[in-house]
Amino acid sequence: IRLSLVGSEMCIRDSNGSRLYLDVGSHPEYATCECDSVDQLLTYIRAGDEEMNSLAICAEENLARTAGSGDVYIFKNNTDASGHSFGSHENYLIERTDDFFRISQALIPFLVTRQLICGAGKVLRDPHTGQTSYRLSQRAEHVFDGVSSATTRSRPIINTRDEPLADSSRYRRMHVIVGDSSMAEPTTALKLGSTLLILEMLEEGIEVSDFYPQDPIDAIRIVSRGLDGQAPFLLKAGGTSTALEVQRVFCTAAAHYLETRPTDEQTPRYRWTINLWNRTLDAVESGDLTPISRDIDWVIKKSLLDRQRERYGVDYADPRCAKLDLIYHDIRPGRGIFPLLESRGLINRLTDPTEVEKARTVPPATTRANIRGQFVTHCLDSGVSFSADWTHLKYASSPSTEVELNDPFESMTSEIKSFISHSG
């Protein structure tokens, strides 16, 4: 594990260009390095999971030496028993020249209903009725606005704070904070691939039918309660729609767009995305979820819960259901339900274990993460104090001299190589 504590902010920089730190609420957050493809990002997300597991093992070894024993649990989920929520944030780079407001507004209907294809599932007790039921999304009950600059108290679906973490004259960041933390890699790939396709379409000026909800927050909660995708919500333009209808329209539009889009290295994954997207909608509409029972988190978890309820003759209010809901998100191999199911081939895996192991210490070669990762590695090897964030690198011994990383796609230059070789 090649990690370094940076300054006094409790931020740890990884040699693969990623970041581990304590977020609001003192829970650990792992932020992956910049990636330029879905497959690359899947690999680095998985590398982050394995890094967290390794740190937990180290912590348990330290506890055994100093306190006798102790177990460290790491849950990759979005809510706790006290009603707090922590997000799985997605950051998409878009052109500054595009109309950010137009794209954000057009994206809202897709994001409100996206939980139907990539929700993590949640056993939830309704505080108003006292009834406990199964919902599509963990995050849906914890957002309170459609589009705003807030991130915590009044969480929006899309955060509009203009912090591109890149050349602000060229880029903006589409900061989506409504998503659930996915466990199954196909769910993650569908979440990312579908959103990327829709963003590409919107940047190209391709408009989709107007499904903007009359109240996005009311709509997102209605959708979360409707496992069949058929729960109607009001539209701003009048009438009603459903998650199934909205996702069908977006999926069809994305498929048509992909037919005319120039072929590149992303094309195979995008075709795979359209396939799983359609299969998921078909399965939900038919009521037979078997075709996606190894791919979509909320479906996998629901199957586990249904078997447990049938075995014990209980409903969702039984504490064992809440426990199962939680431990599905335990990332620790040998203990967590998800790692066990995946290891037995009961959940599909997309990443290559060899590539994941490499990604734990080696940054992507195609983004500025390569520069940051090489800088961190050099400093760790040399025992040199340093400071590094998403857009700046500097040695502690010469804080007035720093390198700016404003181009996310610049992976190395001769000038930066010279800077890195300098030991401060």
Task: Outline where the language-model segments fall.
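Glycine-rich, flexible loop/turn motifs
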Residues: 1, 16, 132
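Generic recognition of long tandem-repeat/solenoid scaffolds
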Residues: 28-30, 174-177, 393
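Generic recognition of cysteine residues
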Residues: 11, 33-35, 58, 118, ...
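Sequence termini and other peripheral, non-core segments
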Residues: 223-424
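Short, Φ-rich (hydrophobic/aromatic) sequence segments
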Residues: 41-46, 189-198, 277
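Signature for HUH/AEP ssDNA processing cores
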Residues: 13-72
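Single conserved hydrophobic/aromatic residue that forms the stacking wall/gate
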Residues: 1-7, 11-12
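Loop-rich catalytic cores of soluble enzymes, especially ATP-dependent carboxylate-amine ligases
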Residues: 70-82, 86-239
